[in-house]
Amino acid sequence: MIAAAFRRWKHARRFARASAEIMARDIAPRPHGLAAPLVVSLTSYPARFPNLHLVLRSLLAQTLRPDRVILWLTRDDAARLPDSARLPGLEIAICPDWRSYKKIVPTLLEVPDANIV
């Protein structure tokens, strides 16, 4: 019981430190220099929405700037997306519920010649 409480406290402390570091980052990335567009493609689901803004902010604050960052969601999930996850520079796109494939298949169909991460 004490060990579990300690683990929760330690996790919360680590999470708070990481969150503060991500939120304090200066967003001034440099161009990637690739011949083809660089696209970051990802998906999520409602259980992960509470922390999604941190993931997105971290992706948008990388040292190399992608041409596009696309978050693929189902229509139902997009309706539940919190405002904290709607960040400048992020494209929110709707696709069928292809589970984990919804992060790559729609991007391949939309920008087949891009470098996709």
Q: Where does each model-flagged region fall?
A:
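Membrane-proximal basic amphipathic "stem/tether" segments
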Residues: 1-30, 35
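Flexible, charged surface loops at secondary-structure boundaries
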Residues: 32-35, 63, 109-112
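Cell-envelope/extracellular polymer assembly enzymes that use nucleotide-activated donors
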Residues: 36-41, 68
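A conserved hydrophobic helix/loop-capping motif in glycosyltransferases and polysaccharide synthases
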Residues: 39-47, 62
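Alpha-helix N-cap/loop-to-helix initiation residues
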Residues: 48-49, 100
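Aromatic/hydrophobic pocket-lining residues that form the small-molecule binding cavity
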Residues: 52
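Short, acidic, metal-binding catalytic loop of nucleotide-sugar glycosyltransferases
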Residues: 55-67, 85
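Active-site-proximal specificity loops/subdomain of glycosyltransferases
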Residues: 72-115
